[in-house]
From Swiss-Prot:
PANTHER family: 50S RIBOSOMAL PROTEIN L9. One of its GO terms (biological process) is translation. This is Large ribosomal subunit protein bL9. Gene3D superfamilies: Ribosomal protein L9, C-terminal domain (3.10.430.100), Ribosomal protein L9, N-terminal domain (3.40.5.10). It comes from Orientia tsutsugamushi (strain Ikeda).
Length: 171
């Protein structure tokens, strides 16, 4: 299926790119979410005339995502969960729970591509706020607040040993 992208899509293309994708991906993902339109001659003419507006809209999205990134980049989010003695969680922490705890405004749709976190400790997670804007956050999973502080101290000590900047909890 040939489509014209009207929003940038990670690992697929930018605005105005004509892409050939699987029928299911186009019908079930790109078209319903308004990331693309069918590549017909009429649609190509329409997109060429509105490319300026699309680029401005894309730039506004990038600016909003960068503003959010400034707030959350390299921040810590602490989850207090029940764990077994060997540090395995009873359950897991999913991307949906992380996004909910980030409390990002509804204008920005954050995307986190991770497997559920099932162990205690500090985990690094990449957050995509826009196709072109990404940041890293740290998930601190512990049984109690004191254990979370211990993990943070160990993490900061490890960073000092590698000559990186010391991170402090932003929550």
């Amino acid at each position: 299926m040939k489509l014209i992208l009207i929003k940038p899509v990670k690992k697929l293309g930018k605005i105005m790119d004509i892409v050939d994708v699987a029928n299911g991906f186009g019908r079930n993902y790109l078209l319903p979410r308004n990331y693309a339109i069918r590549a017909t001659n009429a649609n190509l003419e329409i997109v060429k005339s509105t490319v300026q507006q699309l680029n401005e809209k894309n730039q506004k999205g990038i600016d909003a995502a960068q503003a959010v990134m400034q707030k959350i980049d390299r921040s810590f989010i602490t989850f207090i969960c029940q764990t077994s003695d060997d540090g395995k969680l009873f359950g897991s922490i999913t991307a949906k729970e992380i996004i909910k705890k980030l409390q990002i405004s509804s204008d920005i749709k954050a995307y986190i591509d991770i497997k559920p976190i099932k162990t205690a400790g500090i985990h690094e997670v990449e957050v995509s706020l826009h196709a072109e804007v990404h940041c890293k956050i740290f998930i601190n999973v512990a049984r109690s607040n004191t254990e979370a502080q211990e993990y943070l101290k160990k993490f900061n000590a490890a960073l000092q040993n590698t000559n990186n900047n010391v991170l402090v909890e932003k929550n």
